[in-house]
Amino acid sequence: MFADKLHPFLDRYDEISTLLSDPNIANDIEKMTKLSKEQSSIEPVATAATKYLQILNDIEENKALLEDAELGELAKEELKSLEISREKLEEEIKILLLPKDPNDDKNIFLEIRAGTGGDEAALFAGDLFNAYIRYAELRGYKFEIVSQSEGNTGGFKEIIVLIKGKGAYSRLKFEGGTHRVQRVPETESQGRVHTSAVTVAIMPEVEDSEIEINPNDIRVDVMRSSGHGGQSVNTTDSAVRITHIPTGLVVTNQDGKSQHKNKEAAMKVLKARLYEMQEQERLAKETSERKSQVGTGDRSGRIRTYNYPQNRISDHRINLTLYRLDAIMAAGLFDEIIEPLITHYQAEAMLEAGI
């Protein structure tokens, strides 16, 4: 019975509440912090479980009244309402019981790179960047550009943005992968549709304690900053390139006002990339074991197609097609795709967990 799965959470919540009121525990800051954190993580389930068990109790009470001459009809109507509430709350609890992604509440580094398609790919990278920024603004997230390399005719060859806001990773983690665009470039005189692509990486911002880099494993090169067209923008060598020797990862930053700022920003991106690399290795291992349909950042996988002539946007992981590409891109309405992706992931996770 579903209710049986809830009692351990309620028992543990009550146990923690008792422990937190113990004067001996109150004097142990480390233990107090650990218990408070556990209580916060259990509280949503405990609160919902209490409501659920009360609904079950109300259902039984109303069932007992069905044969009553005066209250039978009223009990029948009440049972209908209670059953609807029970089903809705049960689904909510199932989602709460799913293992929480430890990165979900983190800020993210959004990296967009032009792929096949040359200048047109760079232009689309710019369009996608603008759409994501509109999405970030809709959700109340803050953002700052970490580094950028502009395309020859506009857009970006590469741009990295730090997006700050609670739950940023949980909303955008499914955006990682290859985004294909089909449209007629402005420079196309014959009206032919060209296909190009950009790759998107979503990397959680990591704390210094989460990933350590041996100073001997990196090489830091200082260069002259360059602006549009490659011209020098100052007289100091402030641009920084950091190479992580064991992996070959290279991060360059020149957007800060000083060498120190550029090095600090480059190190943050490097840590995020190394963390992402570790996550990809872990996910690859898990995926090989359970063949998950929805990836959470595989750069190699083609996840979405943007077809401008048809005003169509298709997400290939869940076979979702919407004919409102113009509105989604113009207003950053990515939740129209993200919500179905989250629902799909949750259903898949419930199936695996046997919930």
UniProtKB/Swiss-Prot annotation:
Matching InterPro entries: PCRF, Pep_chain_release_fac_I, Pep_chain_release_fac_I_sf, Prokaryotic/Mito_RF, RF-1
Disulfide bonds: none
Source superkingdom: Bacteria
Places the protein is found: Cytoplasm
Pfam families, alphabetized: PCRF, RF-1
An example molecular function term from Gene Ontology annotations: translation release factor activity, codon specific
Modified residues (N5-methylglutamine): 231
Any one GO CC term of the record: cytoplasm
Biased composition annotated in UniProt, kind: Basic and acidic residues: 283-292
Keywords associated with the record: Cytoplasm, Methylation, Protein biosynthesis
Similarity-based family: Belongs to the prokaryotic/mitochondrial release factor family.
Function of the protein: Peptide chain release factor 1 directs the termination of translation in response to the peptide chain termination codons UAG and UAA.
NCBIfam families noted in UniProt: prfA, PRK00591.1
Protein name: Peptide chain release factor 1
Organism, scientific name: Campylobacter concisus (strain 13826)
Gene name, Swiss-Prot/TrEMBL: prfA
